[in-house]
A protein has these predicted regions:
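Sec-dependent signal peptide cleavage junction
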Residues: 22-39
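Active-site-proximal helix/loop segments of hydrolytic enzymes
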Residues: 38-41, 66, 70-208
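Hydrophobic alpha-helical membrane context
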Residues: 22-23, 59, 134
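Sec-dependent N-terminal signal peptides
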Residues: 7-25
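Short, functionally important structural connectors and interaction interfaces within domains
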Residues: 4, 21, 184-187
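Short, Lys/Arg-enriched, disordered terminal segments
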Residues: 1-12, 34-35
Length: 208
């Protein structure tokens, strides 16, 4: 097998090993969940980005076309399988095959299932070959500082694990609304719909 192919496969495996990244965040969630009820399972909702007619980013390599929607789903399934080996953890997925779900529908599904954490999984593309690595977006501190703090802690834990797998560290980030969208308390909202709606629904939302 060529060296380039080996490197690519290693990176793909690192992506699938994102299953381990969520495990890294479990202690943070357990502290919060056990404050309410030690018997209550931790509910994690995985959101494989895109789906159906929305293919997301696309990359051609070695004669094959890879679509983001498919890679996101594969990673989510690997994460779910790994997470379900832990006692006291319940995992849901916003989609289990190739179909489209609206952004609002994804968070509504998480809320319906009593989510403690919502994790959207994405793989970006760039025309610049030097752009690579991983980052995690988490909620800002506005409107509900507790959710913001929890989200930041889990985001950092996930990012640490991804960096340990060999991915370039692009940091843990927040992105505020650029259109002056506000939370109910008139504070500046988060930019990303799934993070904003997760916060107003009572749980932290991340984008990995």
């Amino acid at each position: 097998m060529k060296t380039k192919q080996k490197k690519m496969i290693k990176k793909l495996l690192a992506g699938v090993m994102a299953a381990a990244m969520l495990v890294a965040g479990l202690p943070v969630l357990q502290v919060s969940a056990q404050t309410v009820s030690p018997a209550k399972p931790i509910v994690i909702v995985l959101d494989p980005g895109h789906g159906g007619y929305d293919g997301g980013a696309m990359h051609k390599w070695n004669g094959k076309t890879y679509r983001e929607k498919d890679v996101n789903l594969a990673i989510a399934k690997a994460c779910k399988k790994k997470l379900e080996t832990y006692m006291g953890v319940k995992v849901y997925m916003t989609r289990s095959s190739d179909y489209f779900v609206s952004l609002n529908g994804r968070v509504a599904y998480a809320k319906k299932n009593g989510a403690d954490l919502f994790v959207a999984l994405h793989n970006n593309a760039s025309t610049r070959t030097n752009v690579k690595g991983a980052c995690v977006y988490y909620p800002n501190a506005h409107y509900n500082a507790r959710i913001g703090a929890k989200g930041k802690a889990v985001a950092q834990s996930i990012q640490n694990r991804l960096v340990a797998l060999g991915l370039k560290n692009n940091g843990v980030l927040i992105r505020n609304s650029e259109s002056k969208t506000k939370y109910p308390d008139k504070s500046l909202a988060d930019y990303y719909n799934v993070i904003k709606n997760s916060k107003t629904s009572g749980f932290a939302g991340l984008i990995v």
